[in-house]
Amino acid sequence: MKLANIVLCAGFAALAGACAQPAPEAENLTRWVDPKIGTGGHGHVFVGANVPFGLVQVGPTSIPQDWDWCSGYHESDSTVIGFSHTHLSGTGIGDLFDVTVMPVVGEVTCARGVEEDPQSGLWSYADRSKEVVEPGYYSVPLSRYGITAEMTATSRVGLHRYTFPASDDAAVVFDLENGGCWDKATETGFTFSEDSTRISGWRYSTGWARDQKVYFVAEFSKPAKGITYL
């Protein structure tokens, strides 16, 4: 009996010692994730910031070329016409690209333009050598404007941060007409708050989703100095 008690006490001592060990540091497993897998060929994978099952997929939208651009991003193309808040990923058909936002410097236009003519619209090349693509975070410099665009997302919100060069002509263009592939806007509109820090708007469209209705609110860190409708 005495031997049994000794063994039992030793077992508890070993257990207590094990409990006293420091917890291992949590490993950052997302560092092994490559969100750009599937962005070439016929992969149709979206690149940008989102969370699982979120309503927002905020990221760059390129000048559309053909079926392989239906996610808004293709690894062979570095053009950007804006950062849209909804994208499909890995699908065989295109839609969405709702509420496209583009930071610019200089003359403002609503034309998206074509790559063959750099002055045909507001589009810019993205500096892919400095592009950062991580789970939940996206960043890229816009070569034409000297602007760095960063974004992240929650399940319902896309958050943008634009770093502009020193300029009196910095602006942010909201394009409610832009849509993915077969998507076409049927009704759009928005209103500004009295202090010019908030936009409330809507975009109705038809396409793969025949009666899609998107409502949004955008808040700025600084009041807009002026508002132009194009």
Where in this protein do the model-derived segments appear?
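Bacterial N-terminal signal peptides
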Residues: 7-16
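Positively charged n-region of N-terminal signal peptides that target proteins for export
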Residues: 1-5
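Accessory carbohydrate-recognition regions in carbohydrate-active enzymes
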Residues: 23-230
